[in-house]
Each structure stands twice: as C-alpha cells, then as structure tokens.
Amino acid sequence: MDFFSRVPLYDELSGLSQPETKCKLEEFTFSNFLKARRVREFLRAHAVAKLPAMRYVYVYYLFSRIGDYIGDDTVLAIFGEFMGVSDAGKARGEGDGESDVHGEGEEEGDGGGEAEPGVGPDIPEVYRVCECLPVRTKCRISLAIEAITRGQYENNLWEIFRDGIISSSKFYHAVRQQNSSKKLFQPWPIVNNYYPLSPLAFGLRCEDAVKTLLAEFVCGRKEVMCDVGFLQSPKDGIFGVSLDMCANVSVGRDNLLEFRADAEIYEIKCRFKYNYSKIECDPLYQKYVSLYNSPSKTTLIRFLSGINRPAVEYVPPGKLPTKNDFLLTSDRDWDLSPKRKRNLTPAHKSLYDCLRANEHASSQVLILSDPSETEGKIDIKARFDVDVFINPEHSYFYQILLQYKVVKNYIQYHSSPGLGSLKTFIVSGFFRKRNHSDPLECSIGGRGTLDSACEIPVLLILTPVYIPHCVVTESLKKASQYWNQSAEEEFSHPPWVSSSLFADGDMTP
C-alpha cells in the first residue's frame, strides 16, 4: 500500500474480502513507511532526522490515508492546527496507485521527500512541524490513537501501531539487550490460538473476570477503564503499552482518556497452570479446601506449594532472587524447600534499589466464595495481607515499569493538576474448572456477572509495585540504545532516538 497515493483508500480496497482488506491495512506499518521511496530520500538528505518527530510524521501520513476510510478525523484535525493548510489530509503525493515501498538497494532520485506542486505539505515541511509540536499536543495525538485502537487484539489498527515500538512484552528483552524473537520492525505475526482449551483463550476469559472482581471489590466507586487501546509514549515515540485495566481515569467529551494524578494501573496475570479441578483426586483441590475453610497465611502457603513453580520464591535479605517466579518473600514460613542463594553484590545496584523499594510491601489476598454454596453469588469470603512483593528480576516487573513511565507522561503533560500519585499493581488470578454443582449463571458482587464459559475464580493476590526513579531512567536509556541498534540493522538511513529524551521529568512513584 502506498502512503502517498491520491486514490481514496475506500476505492483501493473496494471488492476485497475482509481477510484481504485486513492484510492490506497491515501494510501501513512504521517499517514500511521508513522504506517508502520518498521517505528514504528524505532520511538520506536529512541525516539528523530524529524520533519522536519521524514517528509523528508517520502518524500524519497514515491518517491522511486511512482517516476517511475509518471515519475518524480527530488525529488530522489536531495536526491541522499546526500545518497552516486548509486540509491536513492533502499530504498524498501524485501517484498512479503503485506502491511507494521498495527495497533498500534500489536506485532513486534525491528529491528529499518533496511532494508534487499543489498536492499538500511535503515531508520536510511535515517533519519541521512535528519537531516543534508541544508535548501536550503529542499527548492529544497519542490519546486519539488510543481511542481508535480500543479493543486491542480485536482491532486491526492496534497491531499496526505496535510495529517499531518497544512494547511491554518486549521491554525486558530491550533492557537486557537480548537478541531474541522480540523483533521490533516487521515482527513475526502473533499466532493467537483461541481454541477454548488453549492457555491464551483461558487467560483472556479469566482476565475479563478479574477486571469485574477488581471493579467490584477493590476499586469501589472509582472510575475504571477496562478497554484501553494502544498508548504510545508521547515524548519519544519508541515505547507503547496496552493496559489491562486502570482506575481514576475517565473519558472526556472528546473521547480522549484523562488520567488523574492518583490513577491506578492493574496488570493482570491468570496463569493456565494454576487451573485445577474440583475433584477429590486433584491434590491441589484438597489444599484449596483447607484454604477455603481456614483462610490464613499458612493454608495459602500450602495451597501455592502444590503448584509447580508456585509464583512465590523465598529469598533471604541480601540474597539474589532467580528469574523463575514473579513474586518474592523474605518470610521464613515460605521456605519449604531450602536452597542456596547467591549474594547480592555492588554489580546488582539497580536490583538492590528495586528490592529495597518493594521488600516492605504487603500483598492483599482475596479468598472468594464458592458459587456452588452461595446460589451463584461470588463475594469476598476472606481478606488478609501477606509479606509478598514483586520480583524485580522478573519480566513482569519491567512490563509494569514501562506502563508506569508512559502513563506518568500523560499525567505530567496532559492531565489537570491534582493530589495523589500514580500507583501500579500486579494482580494474580487463580481459577478452577467448572463443576456440575456450579450454577450456569454466577454474579460477582452487587453488579458484576461471570461469563458462563469462564472458569470459577477462587483467589486474587493484589501486589503493589514500587519503581525507583534511577531504575526508570537507566532502563529507558538501555532500551533506547536497543531501539537504535535494531533500526540500524533494519534500515540504511534510520531515524535516531536520543537518550536525552529520558533525562527529565518526575518519575518517582
């Protein structure tokens, strides 16, 4: 697909089936934009082209092509405030409908990205505008993208915007400078297995149930948002996140999210291996019965110990945790199978800072009532705290770190001033398989319902996550180096992202 074609996209896609249309739209990626002939000419002539300016240039030309097709002109209207042209959508070059994307080694003229006379702003002009966009305007553009991409994996545009982005799932690998399958540009397509018994389908079903549980029993009267689209990092254009759920956030009259200063982020984890059956021969069920009848730290430890790699690792103070489990504790009661641990050293300074920030945090445990005993009503049976905290060596910690950074930028540069501070949580959901004794229809609290196809929730562990400022800035700089390295490997004239983008701003929780 040509980013600069003057042929309306509706006409180009006319007559195509839905799968064919989806494939065509998926060609409008940041990678293909950087490989377009006119863009390569511009990058070759302007060796100092940087991000986030080039990312916003891409966004401008993308919505010049797809805005009318998707029936949303919000993004172009924001650009139009700065372009000085009557129609911000007239950025398409003269073309005959052929693709403007070519291989890196093809011969080409040195036009510097200029458009044909009378067509609209050329690439250098758009780049100059994007270089000077105020951060608040970048936030508005990025929030408009979020609104358009709600639905996440069910939304075709959501996957398009993830190209060239270090997302939450890729951030850990970027910080650790690992060469893995987490490719940033033209990534391998995500193969989603929605077979009902697959771990992915299980996780999606249970995630929706956990959102309802949190809204009913944790968030109370707070405004919650359970359908958040792609949130691009407005200041740098190389990071992006898709939140599972957030609280103290609202949707304004312009359909843009408004994060309050005391917003809350919830990252939900429902592991398939925690699922068990309500039958006598399932050893995990026997331990759950003890937990259900006598809710306490002791019965919780016994229940979790029945799971292979049971989420919580015992680590004495001054020792190095492994990367196996995403929760830690220094409470000796959890040390059921003593193992030797390596000592923390000065080389582990960032890890030490993270451990010190989180080691005194407590997790809240919610034991849920069994709907087979309560006529289908799921409520809180017991609530207590345990000395369990996040493992900063685990990839989940870095997922939350990036979510914190992106949302914090929106609070800093777009939200109205207010009291409070951004909070982050990781929520561990435990479920059991449905039994013949379970009602088909179950209610959650006073307003929520449980999907009849979903397993039965039995337990939630709510863990606060604290992120030191020094670890945020260090991680972002390392990840930006990874982005630059990946771009140099992919493109002959890549745009550049400066580490100075991450040197300012109050990032302290």
Curated annotation (Swiss-Prot):
It is found in: Host nucleus; Host cytoplasm. Its main location: host cell. GO terms for biological process: symbiont-mediated degradation of host mRNA; symbiont-mediated suppression of host gene expression. It is an enzyme of class 3 (hydrolase). The keyword NAD does not apply. The lineage of its organism: Viruses, Duplodnaviria, Heunggongvirae, Peploviricota, Herviviricetes. It comes from Equine herpesvirus 2 (strain 86/87). The gene is 37. It comes from the Viruses. One of its GO terms (molecular function) is endonuclease activity. Forms a complex with the DNA polymerase, the DNA polymerase processivity factor, and the major DNA binding protein. Keywords: Decay of host mRNAs by virus, Early protein, Endonuclease, Eukaryotic host gene expression shutoff by virus, Exonuclease, Host cytoplasm, Host gene expression shutoff by virus, Host mRNA suppression by virus, Host nucleus, Host-virus interaction, Hydrolase, Nuclease, RNA-binding. This is Shutoff alkaline exonuclease. The record marks E207, D244, E267, K269 as: Required for function. Residues 90-104 have a biased composition (Basic and acidic residues). HAMAP family: HSV_AN. One of its GO terms (cellular component) is host cell nucleus. Its EC number is 3.1.-.-. The keyword Nuclease applies. Plays a role in processing non linear or branched viral DNA intermediates in order to promote the production of mature packaged unit-length linear progeny viral DNA molecules. Exhibits endonuclease and exonuclease activities and accepts both double-stranded and single-stranded DNA as substrate. Exonuclease digestion of DNA is in the 5'-> 3' direction and the products are 5'-monophosphate nucleosides. Additionally, forms a recombinase with the major DNA-binding protein, which displays strand exchange activity. Belongs to the herpesviridae alkaline nuclease family. Residues 90-120 are annotated as: Disordered.
